[in-house]
Amino acid sequence: EVFPFIKNLGAEDETTYSHHMKDARFTIPTPALLTKVVDLVADVPMDDKDTKGDIYEYMLGKIASAGQNGQFRTPRHIIKMIVELMQPKPTDTICDPACGTAGFLVAASEYLNDHYSTEIFANPEAAKRFSEETFFGYDFDSTMLRIGSMNMMLHGVENPRIENRDSLSEAHSHIAEKYSLILANPPFAGSLDNESCAKNIQ
């Protein structure tokens, strides 16, 4: 019962998270181990709104730093520095074309929350824009799409536009002008299909 509940969070609103969780598999092998995990998490004080996101990011740090397809997790302090240098505004449309765990998008959402919370939650329309029309992330790894959408949800952005897309492909080379701010650590390692790669970045 637990895993179907987790998979279906946000399903009634057709959120990004619920979309990417449809095909997820539950890999905790026994009920006893799940009980132990739940008990450990239950002991963590959750009064601070940032705690869930902080725990999640800590667990992400335990994942191998390099995965398949050239995935690298950008260190948190580097992400934070880049976001602070770029100073995103509530009017920005922010994109990470190789989002992975959505670290840049999370940091941008935290920056906006810290500096513009009155503006972004001034009315239902502004809050909806923040949740649904501000953050765009693309990746072609289904696990990363799940992790990224869950990371955003745990940090208060319930329905970002996180989609399955190869940003380097010719098919998506026309979208650059759609965004006012692009934050990214491009996939420098891994294989690249030169045939499908956009001409302007070959």
Predicted features by range, described:
Residues 193-202:
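A mobile, often basic/glycine-rich helix-loop segment
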